[in-house]
Amino acid sequence: MSLSLLAGCGGQETEEAGEGGEGEGGGKITFMAPDWAIPTEDQLAAFTEETGIEVECSEVGWDDIREKIATAASANECAADVVEVDWSWVGEFYAADWLEPLEVSEEDKADMPTIETFTVDDQVLAMPYANDYRLSYYNTEQFAAAGITEEPQTWDDVLEACRALKETGTVEHPFAIALNAEEKTSTCLMWLAYTMNGVVWNEDGTFNEESVMEALTYLETLINEELVAPEDKTSSGMDAYMRICGGTASFLTGPTSFVSRIQDEELCSVVGQIVPIMTPGKDGKAQQTMPLPEAIGVSSLSENKEAAKTFVEWYTSADMQKQLNETNSAIPTRNSVLEELIDEGTIKNSGAMLEEAKIVSSPFPNGIPSYYAEMSSAMYNAINKMALGELNAEEAYAEMSEALNGLISEE
């Protein structure tokens, strides 16, 4: 097995990573992940002491991991025994047979709803370690200044609140959302349609026209009434999200990481004003929300599969999820651990964070497709054109739908 792609924690290549074969104790494995997923030296030492398995870490930029895995696999080589698996890569990795299926108990599946995202044809391909799902946030003081005393329950409530915020001069562009030509813009349309109607795609993989058109029309209204900021159309999605921390936006549906961001005085100028709430729906609060988690999986080309699986089990255990929250700021994917951290006050001002975690479910009826990246590109480009006034909602839908249907026909 070639490890030429690795620059491990020790900064050295090794030919020993393939030793300690199947079913044996001890040995050495390699782990490739972004910086935020790398365990501490003490944590790795504890794992080695417990199992006899040494772990060589390769800290790789998130954007480069997928390419490194693909490059190695094309030469029938293993980039690393255990690898980062983003939710959006699952379909591609499954189609290419790059991941070894994992055995997961029903108890763990119940405790980690985001496992569904990494499950294809009843096979669990990776175990989620970092929880991200869509949660809503609103600035209670700004809402009150505009005469709004109730928390928004529906998307219509949010729209009317944003109109009031603008009309009263409280906030000029109160709705923060990604509209640039990037991935976050695609997922914004996905979660909006999903929380509105519980569906984004039909069973055959095509868009559910009624649901997606309703979401696009909602976005078009926000754009036309200038309830979103002009800069949201061209700046990064994260910059758009961060407007709520700067006080230039009053409402956001975004990452769970904002539970911490809205309390950090170095990042947020309106600390104490923003509350995490259940995401709105069509007739009341949404019955489901979209997960966007990160996971780790075992390479199908690994020569150390059993040792690698042992590492995955350890890394995603309840105890390690607590440790990784402390050392790496990872939001637990186990609801039992999330609840414990909230109850003991480790995670503060959590609002509806735990309640929302319990309604996480995947919007993909047949799992994430292998053509996800191409589909997402078609989506965010069409939405961005709509934001810039080049397309209306109907035209944006037609462009997206035509591209998706073409991808499906090529399958």
PLM feature segments, named:
Residues 31-36, 57-116, 128-137, 151-159, ...:
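Ligand-binding clamshell of periplasmic/extracellular solute-binding protein-like
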